[in-house]
C-alpha cells in the first residue's frame, strides 16, 4: 500500500512538474543586455521602458497570437554597465545559459555592435531601435536589423533645415565625441553641409571622457560659425549647452545628433534648452498607425499615461522593433520554445517585411538598416519638442536665430 501511495505521489509530482515545464514553454522568453548604469545608463533605461511598454501591452491583450492561441511574453534584461565587451558577454549568457527564445538590441552603437556579433554567431535575429552607426551595416550580417536609418543620414534633417532659415547660414563647425555613433554623425553633418553650401570652419572629435568642454568651445567660438553641429549622446549634449552658456557663446543655431529628445535634457537644463535643434526619426504628429499601438499620437499619449513622460524617438523605434518581431512571429506561426530553424525563418521573414507601424514604415534592407524612414529635425520651444523640419511634417516654424544668453 505504501509503495502504491508513493507511486501515486511521484506520478502526480511528475505530472505537475511536466505541467510546469509545459507552462513555461508556452511563453516567449526574450532577453537583452542594456546599459542601466554608467555613461549611457539614462539612455539605456529608455530602451528598457520601451520594451516593457510593448511587452505589457502584448500581455494585456493575452499574448502573441499564433494560430488562434495566445502566448505571453517574458522579458529579461541585464545591465551591461555601458561597456561593449560586457554586452557581448551578457548576450552570450542569455543565449547559451539562460536559453532565451529571442533577443533584442540594447543601447548605443558600440554595445549593439558587440552584442549583435554574438547574436549573429548563434543565429539569433536582433532588432535594435537605438543603434545606427554605418559600421553596423557593413559587416555582411544576416541577423542584425535596425528600425533606425544610418547615422550619417539620421542627422540630415539638422543640416537640410538650413534651406528654410533666414538669413541662410553660410558657415558651421562640427564637433563630436570619438565613439562609433557620434563620430559617424559628425561625418554625416560634413557630408550634408557640403550639399547645402555650408562651409565647415572646424571639424574636431574629442574623447567621450572629456571634462573641459569650455576650452574646446572657446576654440569653436573663435571661429564664429553660424551653426554648431554636435555629434552627441545625452551627456555630451547637456555638457555642451552648459559650457556654451558659461563662455557666452551663441551661434545662430546649435544642433545635436542625440540627447535633446531625451526627457532629462529639458528637465535638467530648463530654459537653457530653448532653441536647441536635434535629429529625430519620429514625432507624434506624423500620420502613422498600426493595429497594435494605434496612431503615433495614441502611442505618445499612452506612453505618457504609463511613465508620466513622453517618449523620445529611440523609445518609439525600440517599441516598433519589438512589434516588427511580433508580427513576423505571428505570420510564420512560430510557437515557444523557439528553435534554430524557427529563428532562421524569422530572419528571412524580417528581410521580406514591409510593415506599417505607428513609427512609420519598417522595411529592412539587405544590410538590416531601415530603408524607408526619413529623418526629421525637432526643436525645443517653450519646453516642448516641436517638429520643425521638413516643412510637410512641421508643427511650427523654427526659432532662428538663437537669442543670446544675456537676452533670455
List each language-model region with its residue ranges:
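Extracytosolic ligand-binding ectodomains
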Residues: 2-16, 20-408
